Amino acid sequence: MNEILVVTVNEVANARIARVVGPVYGTSIRSRTIVGNMLGGIRAIFGGSQEGYIAMVNQTRDEAIAALKAHAASLGANAVIGMRFDSGEFDAGQGQAMNEVTAYGTAVILEAVM
């Protein structure tokens, strides 16, 4: 599979949009372990950076982008423009919070402009 370009802007320098393929998305859902949640709760009481949560959110975003690229590639696109994130948290029961991130944008076929 060729690398899919993902950008947050709607235009790419030295390229033109040959065809708009359509909307694409990729979603990832992750949770911390019970121990991680307890340690995070203790850190929240005393203040400070939540490295465990930051790492989890970053990994979730990376997975969402990978899924976005796979979706775009499956439709024959070579780029995604206007990429954005949407995120949320939901209760999976028994006090287990799940973090959900969706990356979305418009799949296109770009051609180089000479």
From Swiss-Prot:
Q: Tell me the Pfam families matching this sequence.
A: YbjQ_1
Q: Which InterPro entries match?
A: UPF0145_dom_sf, UPF0145_YbjQ-like
- Name the family: Belongs to the UPF0145 family.
Q: Which PANTHER family does its entry note?
A: UPF0145 PROTEIN SCO3412, UPF0145 PROTEIN YBJQ
Name listed for the protein in its UniProt record: UPF0145 protein Acry_1752
